[in-house]
Amino acid sequence: MAITDYCECRFTAGNGGNGIIAWKREAHYDKGGPGGGNGGNGGNVILQADHNCDSLFFLKNKKHLFAEDGQNGKPDLAHGKNGSDLLIKVPIGTTVKNLENNSVLVDFVHDKQSFILCFGGKGGKGNAAFKSPIMRAPNLYENGDKGEILNVSLEVKYLANVGIVGFPNSGKSTLISKLSNAKPKIANYRFTTLIPVLGVVKYQNNSLVFADIPGLIENASEGSGLGHDFLRHIERCEILIHLISLDPVDNDDPCKAYLQIMDELSKYSPLLVKKKMLVVANKIDVNEGEKRFKKLEKFLQKKSISVLKISALKKELGNLLDRVFELYNKTISQFGANKFSLPMELEKHYVFQNTNENNNDPLNIEKDSLNRWIVNCKRLRYWFDKIPQTTLDNIRRLGNKIKEIGIEDQLKSVGAKKGDIIFFDGCEFVIND
């Protein structure tokens, strides 16, 4: 079965519930005052890394997921219930990007690491919340805010210290099965391994995670064969084992095989060929194995590259583990282990800017072919949605918000006069003064 390590989804947080207008009705107290409760907050969309999750298969066919809306307010000062959060569990190693600008939102590298992807809308106020010594019987209430909507991509990149790369049938699965308790499918034909296989290799009181990456073919960097599906998984590895088969059945020339794999890695990402790498010649026990090894060794010596010879099948690994752990320790002491963490400013999720505090929102006024003034303003859009125009008190409040935004002054500055028509959100208004 093919692994699902990439998907695109649309997530929508819950909308806030609406506040209501209600009045207390108590015996012997006919003027009980306002009693409309606030709406509940909408549920958030939360992503959480889980070590028991190893695929994005459960999201593959779910293109749009929703958190629960908050409930509307109720009479007798009863507030609406908050909407339930939508919790999505993802594999450790998942990177989440905003599809709109391709920016990284979060990189999950720890078990139980959580991230609020979309914030739920705040519940609207009921009329009880507007009561004051000046306004004892307010006919004011609010709609709840809309929940955030985000289109994202989720991509799993496995967290392994050592990646094993090479052509199909080079012996990668056999090698990881001999080094660890991993049980990959092994057979004498190409593309036996169809998904990355991870194995923990313990050696001299130390341990590293090895990843057997499905075999690459020519033009893998352009998507041929399994292509990009698995090249991404070695991006996180500190070091690579480049495994080359010495069996004439697997390739015509081990030197050419080396160059082809290096070329594919370079095309996919120049950073891959800059990683610390061990070149290992496998199947030294086959006919002409020694002869082909000497040819490869001589070829690589010209590039100042050493090569180890092993037989993974017979578990004749020589000093392979010595070299791997030595190179790994040297690498992390020089550069530090991969933390895969984001800069601090990216760890802090942006705040939903659908609020009246967004004072720097630009106000755009243009004249259309019908001689109407077309107004575009996010803050005005927010308050039109927030304040229902169903009571005189609400209409007055909306008028005050329009003045605060400065729309009247802006219209006058561009030449608008009494009797002109203002068009906003499908509605027409007439300037009276």
UniProtKB/Swiss-Prot annotation:
Pfam families: DUF1967 (PF09269), GTP1_OBG (PF01018), MMR_HSR1 (PF01926). Disulfide bonds: none annotated. GO terms for biological process: ribosome biogenesis. Residues 160-329 form the OBG-type G domain. Residues 355-433 form the OCT domain. Mg(2+) binds at S173, T193. Its main location: cytoplasm. It comes from the Bacteria. GO terms for molecular function: GTP binding; GTPase activity; magnesium ion binding. Residues 1-159 form the Obg domain. Its EC number is 3.6.5.-. It is found in: Cytoplasm. Keywords: Cytoplasm, GTP-binding, Hydrolase, Magnesium, Metal-binding, Nucleotide-binding. Its cofactor is Mg(2+). GTP binds at residues 166-173, 191-195, 212-215, 282-285, 310-312. One of its GO terms (cellular component) is cytoplasm. It is an enzyme of class 3 (hydrolase). SUPFAM superfamilies: Obg GTP-binding protein C-terminal domain (SSF102741), Obg GTP-binding protein N-terminal domain (SSF82051), P-loop containing nucleoside triphosphate hydrolases (SSF52540). Belongs to the TRAFAC class OBG-HflX-like GTPase superfamily. OBG GTPase family. HAMAP family: GTPase_Obg. Monomer. An essential GTPase which binds GTP, GDP and possibly (p)ppGpp with moderate affinity, with high nucleotide exchange rates and a fairly low GTP hydrolysis rate. Plays a role in control of the cell cycle, stress response, ribosome biogenesis and in those bacteria that undergo differentiation, in morphogenesis control. This is GTPase Obg. It comes from Mycoplasma genitalium (strain ATCC 33530 / DSM 19775 / NCTC 10195 / G37).
